[in-house]
Amino acid sequence: NCIGEQVPCDENDPRCCSGLVVLKKTLHGIWIKSSYCYKCK
């Protein structure tokens, strides 16, 4: 079971699906506490 794109995940144990990378999400320059899985660009 892997975590899909733009889904919150644990940065220490992300389990993102293949081809995805863990990124910290920003909102108007403010770091949101959770990490998300995103596609590599």
Curated annotation (Swiss-Prot):
Q: Which Pfam families match?
A: Toxin_22 (PF08092)
Q: Which GO terms describe its molecular function?
A: sodium channel inhibitor activity; toxin activity
Q: Is the keyword Secreted assigned to this protein?
A: yes
Q: Which cysteines are joined by disulfide bonds?
A: 2-16, 9-37, 17-40
| Superkingdom of source | Eukaryota
Q: Which residues form a coiled coil?
A: none
Is Secreted among the key words of this record?
Answer: yes
Keywords, ordered alphabetically: Disulfide bond, Secreted, Toxin
- The protein's predominant localisation is secreted
* InterPro entries per record: Hwtx-2-like (IPR012625), Toxin_22 (IPR012627)
Expressing tissues: Expressed by the venom gland.
GO CC annotations, alphabetized: extracellular region
The similarity comment for this entry is: Belongs to the neurotoxin 14 (magi-1) family. 01 (HNTX-16) subfamily.
Q: What does this protein do?
A: Intracerebroventricular injection paralyzes mice. Has no effect on voltage-gated sodium currents.
- Protein name as annotated: U3-theraphotoxin-Hs1a
In its UniProt entry, the species of origin is given as Cyriopagopus schmidti (Chinese bird spider)
